[in-house]
Regions:
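Intrinsically disordered, low-complexity segments enriched in polar/charged small residues
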Residues: 11, 28-30, 73, 79
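C-terminal structural segments of small proteins and small subunits
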Residues: 52-82
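A short, structured beta-strand/loop element
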Residues: 15-52
Length: 82
C-alpha cells in the first residue's frame, strides 16, 4: 500500500490489490475515506467515509484534485491503464 501523498496528518494511498474505477484511500488515525479520482473532466468525489470530519473530507478532495495527474499516473503504474 504505497503512500502517495501526506497532508495535515492524513495519508493518501493506493492499495495494490484494489479494483477499478481509479480511486484512493485517505487514512488518518482510526478513520478512512475512499475517494474516486474521476474521469477526464470530472472532479474527485467521495465514495465512502468512515470517520473523517467534513473539514478533512473537503481538504482531501482539494488535495486530490490538485494532485490528480500524479495520482492517476501512480494508479496506472500499480494497476495498468485506468
Amino acid at each position: 500500500m504505497p503512500t502517495i501523498l501526506r497532508f495535515r496528518g492524513l495519508r493518501v494511498v493506493i492499495y495494490s490489490d484494489d479494483h477499478r474505477p481509479p480511486h484512493v484511500h485517505v487514512i488518518g488515525a482510526d478513520r478512512e475515506a475512499k475517494i474516486a479520482l474521476g474521469g477526464e473532466g470530472q472532479r474527485p468525489s467521495l465514495v465512502v467515509n468512515e470517520g473523517l470530519s467534513r473539514r478533512e473530507v473537503a481538504l482531501a478532495l482539494v488535495e486530490i484534485d490538485r494532485n490528480r495527474a500524479l495520482l492517476m499516473q501512480r494508479w496506472r503504474e500499480i494497476h495498468g491503464d485506468a
